A protein has these predicted regions:
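Conserved alpha-helix/loop element of class I SAM-dependent methyltransferases that forms part
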Residues: 79-117, 133
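A short acidic, Gly/Pro-enriched loop at the edge of an enzyme's catalytic core
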Residues: 180-192
């Protein structure tokens, strides 16, 4: 269900005076919510003039799987670009030695207790734009589980030339329900990735999702999170008739998107029992040279850990 679109882009830092100095990756990292201009406040007010009706909103919820299946029927594997950036942003995804699973950086073998294969679950795997770049880049330390609400997306993952059930398993799943426990056992995962997926879920169901993930993950395991941030350009551009609720919208194709505040993400994970290791807004200026477009993007990025068992 991932929703970061495919386009030729070049990222530059956001030089807005209100924000701190950009990081060396060209991003601006901050815990402050964007300050709206008068024009931007007017855009949000316009959205309220015609809201999605409660009947329409309920219908969208019931038909969420259908809309994502239709999305992948239209777009197949062409819509999203491969996420080779994830290992740059989340070093936890890196293998100790990409060439030899179970080997440390100096070439020595880990002991038997340490040599157990790590397990990773990508929630909202789409067509595999995170997991297959990991494999292509040599990070094969994991047994990978990959799930998506859309059975069509999962079928596209299974058809990929790198799909191999010796070290991965893709399956359809509604992560808002206990359905996932039919495939993945409790306390079995080292890492769970949530990359542009929670935004596609009704905000009222998010606590249940994070609670399920807490049950799945091992003590000391990690959740890696990235999603749309409050007042992102895409949120401001919605017209009247697309707003379902506060910061929650429907696109033309029937898929939905929520825009997160940094503090609500932290609260969501803390209430489920996670420790917040990192959580902040990422302000990025995205330039589409082909279309001569220069737009500011806002994401929330975080790392959340299930507390380790006391020794």
């Amino acid at each position: 269900m991932a929703t970061d679109s495919k386009s030729p882009t070049v990222d530059k830092s956001d030089v807005t005076a209100r924000l701190p100095k950009p990081s060396n990756l060209g991003d601006v990292v901050t815990d402050r919510t964007k300050v709206l201009t008068d024009v931007e406040r007017g855009q949000l007010e316009e959205q309220n003039k015609r809201m999605v009706t409660p009947f329409q909103a309920q219908k969208l919820e019931h038909e969420a799987r259908k809309h994502w299946d239709l999305f992948y029927k239209r777009n197949d594997t062409r819509f999203f670009k491969d996420r080779h950036w994830t290992t740059r942003e989340f070093s936890e995804l890196l293998s100790e030695n990409p060439a030899v699973p179970g080997t440390l950086a100096d070439g020595t073998r880990r002991n038997d207790a340490e040599n157990q294969q790590k397990t990773l679950l990508e929630v909202g795997c789409g067509v595999g734009n995170l997991i297959f770049p990991l494999i292509e880049d040599g990070h094969r330390d994991y047994f990978i589980y990959a799930c998506d609400l859309s059975p069509r997306a999962v079928e596209l993952v299974r058809k990929h030339n790198l799909y191999d059930e010796r070290y991965m398993r893709a399956f359809p799943c509604d992560i808002t329900t206990p359905e996932v426990f039919g495939t993945v056992t409790e306390h079995s995962l080292d890492i769970v990735t949530l990359i542009f997926v929670l935004s596609a879920i009704h905000p009222e169901k998010l606590p249940a999702v994070v609670a399920n993930i807490f049950r799945l993950i091992k003590p000391g395991g990690m959740v890696l999170f990235r999603d749309y941030g409050r007042y992102d350009m895409a949120q401001l551009r919605f017209k009247a008739g697309h707003k379902i609720g506060e910061n929650f919208y429907v696109r033309q194709d029937g898929t939905r998107s929520y825009y997160f505040a940094e503090d609500e993400v932290a609260t969501l994970f803390r209430q489920a029992g996670f420790a917040v290791l990192l959580n902040s807004y990422i302000h990025r200026r995205t330039i589409n040279a082909k279309e001569n477009i220069d737009v500011p993007r806002i994401f929330v990025q975080g790392k959340f850990q299930k507390p380790p068992q006391p020794e």
